[in-house]
């Protein structure tokens, strides 16, 4: 399969640069992966699409204000995007500057907010491929506190605007809990407290996994043959409680519904790990990095339905959706979405997809 197989034309005006003021008011394209049928709805209609006893799996990661601006000791400007927090004072980051900082270089962060010569001092300790290991010099303040003071919300590049105060709330799910993501699990942005309460009242069950979304989620696939692509690694937690709920749901003949591709990748990583250790019919707790890459031809061991946003052309995420709903069904649904002027990407509209259990390759 070629990367170009997953391309589609998207007018720039369909890229959502601001969210809806009412989370549940976005549009919802319902896709039946078995037969390709499409229905146009509003997101609040998920209440009618999810049955009593079904299990919703959410990703409870919380986006950190991971983007910082500053300068090197030489005076050169830098932009720092935290990729992963290593401990209270060390982190891995992408650094943009005219010249990459060398090991031992001093960095002064947050001068855009704290004022010139008042930046928070840090040191570049080592380089790990494309990432830089950075350590705060002042050990009296934790990294999260520093980010809350000087950091900016790391809006995706396609939103193409500076972050605003409203993004601190809008680019965060209402159930986010565990800090560590540098991109939001955007399918969850459409749920508000009222909808969650209505789902609970209907008898829908909830469980939460944690996958800290990294900046690598926006990296393009740089090989022509998608089987040659190597996914970036992200940290995942799937608890015993989640596993028990999934097993009970399956035994009851109900559906496991993943909210977002990150929830899919978390659950399927845990199931794949169990299979590799000789338990093909089970899902087991998983606390580790995952670099699982799901594309047409890969099977889904757990997930029955998927709630997701509309993704970038040629991205690993549209490949995952194509594996779930079928390639032809997915590309046809995207064609319909463009024609009907759905809003795309992180702040855009959503899909509700039933799995195609018979799909193989580019079908």
Curated annotation (Swiss-Prot):
Compartment(s) where it occurs, according to its Swiss-Prot or TrEMBL record? Cytoplasm
For the keyword Protein transport, the answer is: no
Which Pfam family, an example, fits this chain?
A: Queuosine_synth
- Give the main EC class: transferase
Q: What is the lineage of its organism?
A: Bacteria, Pseudomonadati, Pseudomonadota, Gammaproteobacteria, Pasteurellales
Q: Which organism is it from?
A: Haemophilus influenzae (strain ATCC 51907 / DSM 11121 / KW20 / Rd)
Q: How does it assemble?
A: Monomer.
Key words of the record? Cytoplasm, Queuosine biosynthesis, S-adenosyl-L-methionine, Transferase
Primary location: cytoplasm
Functionally, this protein is described as follows: Transfers and isomerizes the ribose moiety from AdoMet to the 7-aminomethyl group of 7-deazaguanine (preQ1-tRNA) to give epoxyqueuosine (oQ-tRNA).
Output one GO BP term.
Answer: queuosine biosynthetic process
Pathway(s) it belongs to? tRNA modification; tRNA-queuosine biosynthesis
Which positions make up the signal peptide? none
Annotated InterPro entries: QueA (IPR003699), QueA_dom1 (IPR042118), QueA_dom2 (IPR042119), QueA_sf (IPR036100)
**Known PANTHER family for this protein?**
S-ADENOSYLMETHIONINE:TRNA RIBOSYLTRANSFERASE-ISOMERASE (PTHR30307:SF0)
EC identifiers of the protein: 2.4.99.17
- State the protein's name: S-adenosylmethionine:tRNA ribosyltransferase-isomerase
Q: Which HAMAP family match?
A: QueA
Q: Which gene encodes it?
A: queA
Molecular function terms from GO: S-adenosylmethionine:tRNA ribosyltransferase-isomerase activity
Q: Which reaction does it catalyse?
A: 7-aminomethyl-7-carbaguanosine(34) in tRNA + S-adenosyl-L-methionine = epoxyqueuosine(34) in tRNA + adenine + L-methionine + 2 H(+)
Q: Give the UniProt entry's GO cellular component terms.
A: cytoplasm
Give the similarity note. Belongs to the QueA family.
């Amino acid at each position: 399969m070629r990367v170009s197989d997953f391309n589609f034309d998207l007018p720039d005006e369909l890229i959502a640069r601001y969210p809806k003021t009412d989370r549940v008011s976005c549009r919802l394209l319902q896709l039946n992966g078995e037969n390709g049928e499409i229905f146009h709805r509003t997101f609040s209609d998920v209440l009618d699409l999810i049955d009593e006893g079904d299990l919703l799996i959410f990703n409870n990661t919380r986006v950190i204000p991971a983007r910082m601006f500053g300068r090197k000791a030489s005076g050169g400007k830098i932009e720092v995007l935290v990729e992963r927090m290593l401990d209270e004072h060390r982190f891995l980051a992408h650094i943009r500057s005219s010249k990459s900082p060398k090991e031992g270089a001093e960095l002064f962060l947050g001068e855009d907010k704290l004022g010139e010569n008042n930046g928070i001092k840090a040191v570049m300790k080592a380089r790990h491929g494309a990432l830089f290991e950075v350590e705060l010099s002042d050990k009296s303040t934790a990294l999260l506190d520093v980010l809350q003071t000087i950091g900016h919300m790391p809006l995706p590049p396609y939103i193409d605007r500076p972050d605003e105060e409203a993004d601190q709330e809008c680019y965060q799910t209402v159930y986010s809990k565990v800090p560590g993501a540098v991109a939001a699990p955007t399918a969850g942005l459409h749920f508000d407290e009222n909808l969650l309460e209505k789902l609970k009242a209907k008898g829908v069950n909830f469980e939460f996994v944690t996958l800290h979304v990294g900046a690598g989620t926006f990296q393009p696939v740089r090989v022509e043959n998608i089987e040659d692509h190597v996914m970036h690694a992200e940290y995942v937690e799937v608890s015993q409680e989640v596993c028990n709920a999934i097993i009970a749901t399956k035994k009851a003949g109900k559906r496991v519904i993943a909210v977002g591709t990150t929830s899919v990748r978390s659950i399927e990583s845990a199931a794949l790990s169990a299979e590799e250790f000789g338990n093909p019919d089970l899902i087991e707790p998983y606390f580790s990095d995952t670099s699982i890459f799901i594309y047409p031809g890969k099977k889904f061991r757990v997930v029955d339905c998927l709630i997701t946003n509309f993704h970038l052309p040629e991205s690993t995420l549209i490949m995952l959706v194509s594996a779930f709903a079928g390639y032809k069904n997915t590309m046809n649904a995207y064609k319909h979405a463009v024609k009907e002027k759905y809003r795309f990407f992180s702040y855009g509209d959503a899909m509700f997809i039933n799995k195609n259990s018979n799909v193989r390759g580019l079908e």
